[in-house]
Amino acid sequence: YQAHRYRDEVWTFIDGEGVLALDGKMTRIGHGDTVCIRKGMRHAVKGITDLLFIEVQSGAPLVKDDVEWFDWNWKS
């Protein structure tokens, strides 16, 4: 469960099924779904089956250490 200060992300799910945690709400996701994650939104994804998705990042700076980690319980 993480958030970014400087970047937005768009995830497009190509194959598989999973659960998306986005700002405390859980949603089933799968093939054909697209999710827009704005900077500051807490997010994580868990595969029910093997997941394949494309992530596109935008913002500045796009750096590896632009991540803040948070505790998350998938049973919430």
PLM feature segments, named:
Residues A44, I48-S76:
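Double-stranded beta-helix
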Residues Y1-Q2, L20-A21, I37, R42-I48, ...:
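Short beta-strand His + acidic residue motifs that chelate non-heme Fe in jelly-roll/DSBH
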